[in-house]
């Protein structure tokens, strides 16, 4: 069969493997790569290439991650796999590899284990929207009833964390046997790929979302008015659009009267572009770095939220000592630091460097935020933690 030529016009979807240590995440990643390359064309990556994950730095945090790509007839996938549990925690909290969906790998010889639960909880906290289950090592279990029990257990665990445990796809397979080329197990990998295609919806592109631009700088241009600059995070702003200035102070409305990029006047600014936006009737002192410019009504300012936080270890340049309740660091959102206080979960007295923890944060002034927004925790300009907004209270 002729190999289909790779085209960039297919929808791009980000996925990853999650699950307990030694349940076969990396073997499955290699099996998907091999079976799909063999079936639909593309380059296969083997286990050792994936397992030997390169180090990356995201917000000063060292993370080992492997990125591979593969294709199905209708989509292009970018897939992330991490060697160690700590790498998953860091990856999910910093958003270094944001996932449109995850493949939860559970060894049917073991059933759900502690990290299975922790990865499901993390997925819920950081906003991974869809999970598909791959029950691995099914070639080692002869008892069909046992497989059924494990499947029920996994589904119940997912339901416990508000995923649709009863309805999501569960595929029973063997990554190793598929990698070794046994047809009945290769077919299970194709079944998994088909589940990815049908169960994970096509992600909305940044450009189709409501306009938002974090304000980095403010200038006043004589005879023209006030210009704010920044990189458009999502959406499109057009000349004549009404926009809101949100965060830190009371929300105000104004109109975009011009868009500039590299000293050229444009009709619009789009997601990913650095531009200057001229605001009608806005004074230089009405707006500051740390606020955002957004489509009216699309985002609100908040001060209190629950977050999932990773605290940098000493080796990563973080704190050398634990912190306790009453800790008041700065929380860095998009372009600015805001002081806040923390509340630790019941029964937790202190947090050690290298831990990940759920904490409630109250900021001294409101910031434009949605669930899923990433932030850094800093002390005097030094990053000591990374977090994600899990749930907004006020």
From Swiss-Prot:
- Tell me one GO molecular function of this protein: guanosine tetraphosphate binding
The subcellular location is:
Cytoplasm
Q: Where do the record's region annotations for G3 lie?
A: 81-84
Question: Annotated region G2: where?
Answer: 60-64
Pfam families in the cross-refs: GTP_EFTU, GTP_EFTU_D2, GTP_EFTU_D3
- Answer yes or no on keyword Cell inner membrane: no
Disulfide topology: none
Its UniProt entry gives the catalysed reaction(s) as:
GTP + H2O = GDP + phosphate + H(+)
Q: Where is this region: G4?
A: 136-139
A GO cellular component term found in this entry reads: cytosol
Job of this protein: GTP hydrolase that promotes the GTP-dependent binding of aminoacyl-tRNA to the A-site of ribosomes during protein biosynthesis.
Family affiliation: Belongs to the TRAFAC class translation factor GTPase superfamily. Classic translation factor GTPase family. EF-Tu/EF-1A subfamily.
What name does UniProt use for this protein? Elongation factor Tu 1
Q: Which organism is it from?
A: Shewanella sp. (strain MR-4)
Lineage, highest ranks first: Bacteria, Pseudomonadati, Pseudomonadota, Gammaproteobacteria, Alteromonadales
